[in-house]
Every structure is written in structure tokens, then in C-alpha cells.
Amino acid sequence: EAGEAVGEPAWPMPLPDEIRTLMDSEVADVLQMAANMDRAGHMLQGGLFLREFVADGVPWAHIDIAGPSYHSGEATGYWVKGGTGVPVRTLLHLLEQS
């Protein structure tokens, strides 16, 4: 809702168990990156990795900014060419509403 209000729409992504099992390790608690996965799943892997360090019942969010953090096209709306600042507006709105 905060993202929608400031023009930075977002949605919750899944944390698939089938990807988490690819992050199992014989020498570490968890691998940072899943074995045998391409870049397409990195955002999901990041969320799964972070979840390992959050206690049950504690609300948390993985805000992945790799995709929208840089706009290489022409300026449009408040999007300038270059660094976008996504999700700064969303986080500020969320803080202002709390």
C-alpha cells in the first residue's frame, strides 16, 4: 500500500521450499546462493537466506532493489535516467504513516 501511494508498486514474492533445499550445505548452516541456479532466482534466494536469521513470529521484509534501482531509459514521470532511489519514497511513506 505504501508503494502504491507513492508510485512505487510492489508485491509479495514467494519463498519456495524447492529453492531453499538447493541452499542446503554440508559445511554451513545455509548457502548464500543456491547451487545450480541462474540469476533469475536471486531475489527469491536473497529472501530465503534472510529468513534463516529471523526468529519465528518476527515481521520482516526483504526489499530487493536490484531491478528498479537504475533506470537506463529516458526520463519519465519522476524517473530520471540513472539511479532511481527506489524504494526510498516507499520507506519514507511507511515511516510517516506509522
Where are the regions a protein language model picked out?
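A generic structural signal for tightly packed, nonpolar segments enriched in small/aliphatic residues
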Residues: E1-S98
